[in-house]
Amino acid sequence: MAIHLYKTSTPSTRNGAVDSQAKSTPQKQKSLIYGQHHCGKGRNARGVITTGHRGGGHKRLYRKINFRRNEKDISGRIVTIEYDPNRNAYICLIHYGDGEKRYILHPRGARIGDTIVSGTEVPISMGNALPLTDMSLGTAIHNIEITLGKGGQLARAAGTVAKLIAKEGKSATLRLPSGEVRLVSKNCSATVGQVGNVGVNQKSLGRAGSKCWLGKRPVVRGVVMNPVDHPHGGGEGRAPIGRKRPTTPWGYPALGRRSRKRNKYSDSFILRRRK
């Protein structure tokens, strides 16, 4: 990923850094695009804010991504590499030999004109999708299935990559990008390689307005709120939070407290927790 730094001509662009990687800008594939009605903006069915700092943002069209890679043994050609406003990874349009067209996540290093294929007896090369049982140990993978046939659910963000470290019995052992080591069925499929747009964390929006375009509203500290709005609020001047430990706006412990449900069914598949 190529990062372009703005010239310091205005205060808003002085600290900006944007992605300048070459992407094709074709007409969108209309059969794979549809609109979504976003009216919640972080609210639940009662209109109560359950996820903060969401709202506004530019209007988007959703691109239907093929996470299942279910065109078995049919080779496809990468026609475009496109920006997707709904995720931080790029997507690429694939034209398959039977006439089908699909969007998939862009693997790192893939270029327009490259050929990919999915199936059981396909080469272990970048962009190909195949079951874990047919992969060799140490293979870098992404878009990994947890449930057979449901489609990839793990390692889908920009720059993420997992590693196949063991195969025993009916399960395969994976090291995920978070550092977690877990078991997955060997029959689940995954895509070889790393997700593209690796340097996404080097981008700097430079100003608050660019953040608002993404649908992210300002973050306000609880200590500067009123007592009715946050447990940390109130007091005269710069007052401390008045508690032994920080809490969420609803009074639950924050900053370090594990929020994962105890005795969850998938605990038996996790060999080592994430870092």
Swiss-Prot record:
NCBIfam families: rplB_bact (TIGR01171). Part of the 50S ribosomal subunit. The keyword Transcription regulation does not apply. Its main location: plastid. Keywords: Chloroplast, Plastid, Ribonucleoprotein, Ribosomal protein. Belongs to the universal ribosomal protein uL2 family. This is Large ribosomal subunit protein uL2c. Residues 21-30 have a biased composition (Polar residues). The keyword Chloroplast applies. Residues 1-30, 225-275 are annotated as: Disordered. SMART domains: Ribosomal_L2, Ribosomal_L2_C. GO terms for cellular component: chloroplast; mitochondrial large ribosomal subunit. GO terms for molecular function: rRNA binding; structural constituent of ribosome; transferase activity. The lineage of its organism: Eukaryota, Viridiplantae, Streptophyta, Embryophyta, Tracheophyta. It is found in: Plastid, Chloroplast. It comes from Illicium oligandrum. Pfam families: Ribosomal_L2 (PF00181), Ribosomal_L2_C (PF03947). GO terms for biological process: mitochondrial translation.
